[in-house]
Regions:
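Ligand-binding pockets and gating/stacking loops
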Residues: 1-212
Length: 212
């Protein structure tokens, strides 16, 4: 996360004084012309400042129990395999992001978006899908369980989805002799939802016999 620390020579109290001065100037202008964009600007500056000062504590996982870190899969070994969309410790990053999501919920954040963009399975489906499923399965399950144990799941809707699915038929791309992947399939795909007062164990909708 960028820009959490001030540049050298700018202590927090000086930054706060500068923001207060800027807000006073904007407030004076707002009282004269009542432009709502000025009020929005004041609110945006204040929100940015609060986020900057609150983020270091939020992303510090050192006080989390070892059992919690293990449940999410933080610092677990790489599941092995994969390749497309894999940068560094992808599996650990996703686990930490899920844990950070729970910490954000505890602090009243209303909307949280976690992205894992490695599902472009036009080829090498067997290995790629196995790897990506291994990356996300444990952290997502831990997030839902953690929210439930803390009494936060009923007031939090967890949605796991993508923008489209994959065709039920194979795709041959890149000169492969065999169809090793799946193409885009926006006509039928699934999402998982938990919490938010929803009744669990339900399935809505279905495909025909060949997945359309």
């Amino acid at each position: 996360m960028l820009n959490l620390s001030n540049p050298k020579g700018l202590p927090p109290e000086l930054q706060r004084a500068g923001l207060d001065t800027l807000n006073a100037v904007n407030q004076g202008r707002f009282e004269k012309i009542h432009d709502p964009e000025i009020a929005s600007r004041i609110a945006s500056y204040e929100l940015a400042s609060r986020m900057q000062t609150a983020a270091p504590e939020l992303i510090d996982l050192s006080k989390e129990k070892a059992s919690t870190l293990k449940a999410y899969g933080v610092d677990r070994p790489d599941p092995g395999g994969g390749g497309r969309g894999k940068f560094g410790d992808t599996h650990q990053d996703f686990a930490r992001n899920c844990l950070l999501a729970r910490r954000m919920v505890e602090r009243g954040v209303r909307y949280i978006n976690i992205v894992y963009a490695s599902w472009d399975h036009h080829s090498k489906l067997d290995g790629e899908l196995k790897y990506n499923s291994s990356v996300v399965d444990q952290p997502i399950a831990a997030l839902i369980r953690d929210l439930k144990e803390r009494g936060l799941l009923d007031s939090t809707l967890v949605q796991w989805s993508s923008e489209f699915g994959r065709t039920p038929l194979g795709e041959n791309r890149g000169g492969n002799k065999n169809a090793t992947g799946r193409d885009h399939h926006p006509f039928c795909f699934s999402m998982v939802m938990a919490g938010g007062g929803l009744k669990g164990g339900q399935v809505y909708g279905k495909t025909d016999e060949i997945g359309w």
